[in-house]
Amino acid sequence: MTDYIHRKIEETILEASKYFSVIAVSGPRQSGKSTLLTQLFPLYEKYSLKDLNILDYAKNDPIAFLNQTDEGIFIDEIQRCPQLLDYIQGIVDNNPKRHFALSGSSNFEVMKNLSESLAGRAGVFELLPMSIQEVTGKVDLDNLNQILYNGLYPSICAKKNIAKFFYPSYVKTYLEKDVRDLLQIKDQIRFTKFLKLCAARIGSLFNATELGAEVGVSSKTISHWLSVLQASYLITLLPPYYENIPKRLVKSPKLYFNDPGLACYLLDIETPQQLDRDKMRGAIFENMIVMEAIKHRYNMGLEGGVFFYRDSNQNEVDLLIKQEGELTAIEVKSSMTYSSSFEKALTQIEGWIKTPISTKAIVYSGDFENTSGNINLINYRHISSIL
């Protein structure tokens, strides 16, 4: 794989494979799961359940299917045949030296229950699109608008596709496969409207009642549809931070898309240059930085730990990352020009939050950086230095 872009999660997965008989990787379509597992376990026999003949064999004779070899087996698209999990459990219980790698394009029921079905036997990981650190040297990171517009899906970063072709096909496949076939959502027109309205609310508090009124469905339906977007890895809900805080807090999560390029497509942004005129540019930039923090946690095999802060007095900090009992507090600004006003929330945060704060930083798009003061000033290209 000469054009393979190495992923930061590789070391974590290889370490886990020393202790688990099963490695499972889930994530959105086209995030590089199959490529990653093929790279990490090249000697495993690979079977893709996209192949209808292979799928039919797996369903009709799972024991024979799983015992075609005594070597490792990599099963791609495991969610297409969830009954295999019980048989895999039996195999690794009887022979812990047998090894399986599994990938799934969603965290629908099969992936959500996988860690329960194979408790103590499986290392379960999530792979999102590429991080900025992963594509350093592979794409032009100086052109912020281009990064936001293109997004960070592997096929785009590896220059095997371009955004204007990739995202229309991606959304069409998502609507036709995941939404219709797997989730039985009949009203695709309203669901598509809902999807676009979600993109218009990047970085905003999620309000099911308000969104339902715009789409023309109940808040209960909106909540269900939102769970669909989460289950298929299109969006992330960022929870508010609430520990050691005496003030009244906002309880609603913030909504972000898992890739800025997908958000741009849903917002009808047709060129990178259009972003300079678009009111959503700041929110899309914030979206990218928030997802960098979440990807960093996933790549270390960790869940949670990423929050925002907002209280009833409208005091707000864009991003809080909890590590080893301390917080990193980050304000995100899309501007290239530094302003002292960027520091306001970070200078006051100790009055709002009692948890120790180890690092404060402003992440922006300007080139000047300063890491010698109380508040670090960081260009987005170097976000990994404070994660």
Q: Which residues does each predicted region cover?
A:
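Accessory nucleic acid-recognition modules appended to NTPase machines
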Residues: N161-L327
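Short regulatory helix/loop adjacent to the ATP-binding pocket of P-loop NTPases
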Residues: F108-G123, D140
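Conserved lysine of the Walker
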Residues: K33
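Conserved nucleotide-sensing/catalytic segment adjacent to the nucleotide-binding pocket
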Residues: K59-A101
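Hydrophobic positions on the alpha1 helix immediately C-terminal to the Walker A/P-loop
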Residues: L36
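Domain-level recognition of nuclease-like catalytic cores that cleave nucleotide substrates
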Residues: V139, S365-L387
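Hydrophobic anchor at the beta1->P-loop junction of P-loop NTPases
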Residues: V25
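N-terminal pre-Walker A segment at the start of P-loop NTPase domains
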Residues: M1-L14
